[in-house]
């Protein structure tokens, strides 16, 4: 489904994820805004990122930080206006960059007009827009529900929080005894699908380059193997190919063998699902810790399986993090982060850098939940731009800030690191440039793991592109390692940490070395 129609710009895309409310505040209300993003596009471009993933910016009651949408076609006033967002599109494109919006197709806010109409007892256009049972006494099995708040007799399924009613895309295997379980081709589910296409059409026509799709694998119910949801996305892919063939699609699915067949260009390996992503950075003994007690072996095995199943189709992406994960710096120090970024920025697929990870922003401990963040709130604190008032994020009083800043006196900031060639940000910038300068390291370059990083050992992989071959040696553990797999006579292109290479390669602990051979 994704071959010659893949947008060419994905071949060398490096994404920067922006959580808008925490990025840059230009009107002193303590909340980041679209004009603040426009103001900082130069910073993103100077880092080397050429694409943006913008988290939800649509009208919302913000019970889940914007992942509870009240109006898909209106920008939330706290961020600005639709015109501001279109201006952001223009400014991004003027720099030769691209931008994806965050699309939440599985549920809405309870304040959405669709849900208000759906709650009415009298049948109407939106009666079947959500998954409702036929009786308030019957709960949708395996899903939470909303009930007792409507004139309508029934319980409405929810997807995540209890205020996020599930939109009705149908059931792949409806239970004949439960008439409320509508098949995918019933009138209600098809109308929901068309409404989703209308939303996509609206923003693509306005200048968006595509979408990152929230919970993309969860739309069709009673769909254990995902085949119904795959078919739904194939239909949407066909619509995009007809009307917006350049639109890029990335899924939050975590199973590339399904999402890429479904028509997405990219999927993530994430903190949920079968990827073992957490083994690398976010567990009791992460592989990228210098303690050397972690292992990348199960991650490598899962990655190999995904590669085999997708057979070269689409891109498999490994993000530095996102708004739902602990910050990388919660488990890794600066030197460990350097080696982690050397891995992240030399793997196939498009890299995604979560705002602030490039400077080693920390998880802020002990925060009270903000807008449904709960344990995720500490990863959503304001971007630290400089050493000025509120770290340069906002001129508002500290108590007005959306989320409190990292209170540490030594918190990292972008300005200081941009002036320091030895900083983490400078390393990340060099690594992005290294990636872009070498065809073998591009998103679609060839990939073969030579070792699997078992038991804290070095991870070795070979990247190929055109006539170029690069061997990557990633050795996070604090002990040296001999790497017999690297051919003699090669040329070291980039290194973090020490090494000797006189016919055989030996790397120091906490190192990353890249050899062209």
Where are the predicted features?
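C-terminal beta-strand-rich structural cap/linker in extracellular carbohydrate-active enzymes
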Residues: 501-517
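Beta-sheet entry/capping signal
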Residues: 50-51, 96-98, 200, 209-212, ...
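Conserved alpha/beta catalytic core and glycan-binding cleft of carbohydrate-active enzymes
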Residues: 110-146, 233, 237-382, 387
């Amino acid at each position: 489904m994704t071959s010659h129609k893949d947008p060419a710009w994905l071949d060398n895309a490096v994404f920067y994820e922006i959580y808008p409310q925490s990025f840059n505040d230009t009107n002193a209300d303590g909340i980041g805004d679209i004009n603040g993003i426009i103001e900082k596009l130069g910073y993103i471009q100077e880092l080397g990122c050429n694409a943006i993933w913008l988290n939800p910016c649509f009208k919302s009651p913000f019970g889940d930080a914007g992942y509870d949408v009240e109006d898909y076609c209106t920008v939330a006033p706290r961020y600005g206006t639709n015109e501001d967002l279109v201006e952001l599109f223009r400014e991004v494109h003027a720099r030769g960059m691209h931008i994806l919006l965050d699309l939440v197709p599985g549920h809405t806010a309870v304040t959405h007009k669709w849900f208000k109409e759906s709650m009415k007892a009298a049948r109407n256009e939106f009666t079947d827009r959500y998954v409702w049972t036929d009786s308030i006494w019957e709960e949708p099995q395996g899903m939470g529900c909303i009930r007792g708040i409507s004139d309508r007799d029934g319980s409405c399924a929810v997807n995540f929080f209890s205020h996020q009613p599930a939109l009705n895309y149908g059931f792949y295997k409806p239970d004949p005894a439960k008439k409320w379980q509508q098949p995918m081709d019933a009138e209600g589910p098809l109308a929901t699908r068309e409404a989703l296409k209308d939303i996509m059409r609206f923003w693509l026509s306005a200048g968006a380059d595509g979408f990152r799709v929230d919970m993309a694998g969860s739309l069709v119910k009673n769909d254990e193997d995902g085949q119904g949801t795959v078919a739904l996305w194939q239909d949407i892919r066909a619509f995009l190919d007809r009307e917006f063939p350049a639109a890029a699609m990335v899924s939050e699915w975590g199973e590339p063998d399904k999402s890429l067949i479904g028509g997405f260009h990219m999927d993530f390996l994430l903190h949920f699902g079968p990827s073992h992503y957490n083994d690398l950075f976010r567990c009791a003994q992460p592989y990228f810790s210098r303690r050397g007690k972690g292992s990348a072996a199960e991650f490598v095995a899962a990655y190999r399986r995904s590669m085999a199943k997708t057979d070269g189709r689409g891109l498999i992406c490994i993000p530095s993090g996102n708004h739902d994960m602990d910050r990388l710096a919660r488990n890794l120090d600066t030197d460990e982060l350097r080696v982690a970024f050397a891995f992240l920025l030399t793997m196939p697929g498009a890299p995604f850098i979560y705002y602030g990870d490039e400077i080693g922003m920390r998880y802020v401990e002990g925060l009270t939940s903000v807008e449904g963040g709960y344990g995720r709130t500490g990863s959503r604190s304001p971007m630290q731009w400089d050493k000025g008032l509120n770290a340069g994020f906002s001129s508002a009083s500290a108590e007005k800030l959306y989320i409190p800043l990292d209170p540490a006196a030594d918190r990292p900031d972008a300005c200081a690191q941009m002036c320091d060639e030895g900083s983490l940000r400078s390393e990340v910038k060099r690594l992005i440039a290294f990636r872009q300068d070498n065809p073998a390291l591009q998103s679609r370059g060839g990939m073969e793991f030579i070792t699997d990083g078992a038991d804290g050992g070095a991870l070795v992989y070979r990247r190929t592109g055109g006539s170029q071959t690069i061997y990557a040696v990633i050795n996070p553990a604090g002990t040296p390692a001999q790497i017999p797999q690297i051919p003699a006579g090669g040329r070291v292109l980039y290194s973090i940490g020490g090494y000797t290479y006189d016919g055989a390669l030996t790397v120091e602990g906490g190192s990353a070395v890249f050899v062209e051979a």
